[in-house]
């Protein structure tokens, strides 16, 4: 017994000396790193001009300690089929996403949710363009993308993704994940989802900040989604 105690003391000292104040978990480090990466990706567009339409990006301010954890298409599919959690599908350049994120994080903080899984759609989905009157795939989808579409099929609607050029419509013959999309999964089943943000007023564009009324409306949407998943949560714990 004395020998075991000595071994335990040695291991503790090793962790203290070579690992900082203790042996911290890899998962916590990864999530913290993900949160910082997410903050940097979104905030670096503040005050810049979007090339596609010449509009000024809406400004966001994100805390370093946020609940984001990056996942790819295959990991998202596994969560949808087998686990419980919230997945956010978005991209840093998406103006609707930039308006949605502060609201989503506020709800997560109130609900004491530590993790929101994040699928960066730029790193997952394909891109089509019309070139010389033909539909061309200019960016290939990443591994697991079509399996993800299948897993989300029930909430993606019936219509396939189409592009229009010179009055002609081109059908990709596949569904599309539109952003921002927040999906709530409970024990391997999708129980709730919300796509987009809220309706804009006549004097607003997609780059305009949300009004208080719009913020409150979106907040209630996300709050309901979280409650449908974590319905055993109280003010103190989940």
Region roles according to the model:
Residues 2-27:
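Sec-dependent N-terminal signal peptides of Gram-positive bacterial secreted proteins and lipoproteins
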Residues 65-84:
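A short beta-strand-turn-helix
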Residues 70, 89, 113-163:
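Thiol-based oxidoreductase modules, predominantly thioredoxin-like and allied folds used
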Residues 80-94, 104:
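Short active-site neighborhood of thiol/selenol oxidoreductases, capturing the structured segment around
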Residues 98-111:
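Typically the conserved alpha-helix immediately C-terminal to a functionally engaged Cys/Sec
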Residues 171-238:
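Non-catalytic, surface beta->alpha helical segment in thiol-disulfide oxidoreductase systems
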């Amino acid at each position: 017994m004395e020998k075991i105690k000595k071994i335990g003391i040695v291991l503790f000292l090793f962790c203290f000396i070579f690992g900082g104040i203790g042996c911290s978990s890899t998962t916590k480090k990864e999530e913290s790193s993900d949160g910082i990466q997410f903050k940097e990706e979104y905030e670096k567009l503040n005050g810049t001009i979007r090339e596609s339409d010449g509009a000024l990006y809406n400004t966001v301010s994100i805390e370093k300690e946020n609940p984001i954890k990056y996942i790819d298409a295959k990991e998202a599919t596994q969560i949808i089929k087998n686990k419980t959690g919230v997945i956010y599908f978005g991209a840093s350049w998406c103006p609707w996403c930039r308006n949605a994120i502060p609201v989503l994080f506020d709800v997560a903080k109130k609900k004491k949710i530590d993790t929101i899984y994040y699928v960066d759609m730029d790193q997952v989905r394909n891109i089509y363009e019309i070139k010389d009157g033909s539909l061309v795939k200019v960016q290939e989808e990443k591994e697991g993308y079509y399996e993800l579409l299948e897993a989300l099929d029930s909430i993606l609607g019936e219509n396939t993704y189409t592009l229009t050029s010179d009055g002609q419509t081109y059908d990709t013959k596949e569904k599309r994940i539109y952003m921002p999309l927040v999906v709530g999964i409970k024990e391997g089943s999708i129980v709730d989802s919300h796509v987009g943000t809220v309706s804009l007023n006549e004097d607003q564009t997609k780059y305009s900040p949300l009004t208080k009324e719009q913020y409150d409306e979106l907040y209630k949407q996300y709050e309901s989604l979280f409650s449908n998943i974590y319905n055993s949560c109280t003010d103190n714990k989940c």
